[in-house]
């Protein structure tokens, strides 16, 4: 669980904002949402496999786009 130390003369709103940022960075909310309901091991494997395929296709798409731009002589973005 993320924790912060409240600085001297620090407004409460700013401390809350820092705490929220720390929680987001640690992935607390996404972990809570993931654990809200039980997920069967087979469903978890399917979800992870689908995510891996999606990442792979996204990477291929980016590479193809970059290759097309190189062939056309356009600078990369």
From Swiss-Prot:
It holds the Pfam family Ribosomal_S21. One of its GO terms (biological process) is translation. One of its GO terms (cellular component) is ribosome. It comes from the Bacteria. InterPro entries: Ribosomal_bS21, Ribosomal_bS21_CS, Ribosomal_bS21_sf. Keywords: Ribonucleoprotein, Ribosomal protein. GO terms for molecular function: structural constituent of ribosome. Belongs to the bacterial ribosomal protein bS21 family. NCBIfam families: S21p (TIGR00030). PANTHER family: MITOCHONDRIAL 28S RIBOSOMAL PROTEIN S21 (PTHR21109), SMALL RIBOSOMAL SUBUNIT PROTEIN BS21 (PTHR21109:SF22). This is Small ribosomal subunit protein bS21. The gene is rpsU.
């Amino acid at each position: 669980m993320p924790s912060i130390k409240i600085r001297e003369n620090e407004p409460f709103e700013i401390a809350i904002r820092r705490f929220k940022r720390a929680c987001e960075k640690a992935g607390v909310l996404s972990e809570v949402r993931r654990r809200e309901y039980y997920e069967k091991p087979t469903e978890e494997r399917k979800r992870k496999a689908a995510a891996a395929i999606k990442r792979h296709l996204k990477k291929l798409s980016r590479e193809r786009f970059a290759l097309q731009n190189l062939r056309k002589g356009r600078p990369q973005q």
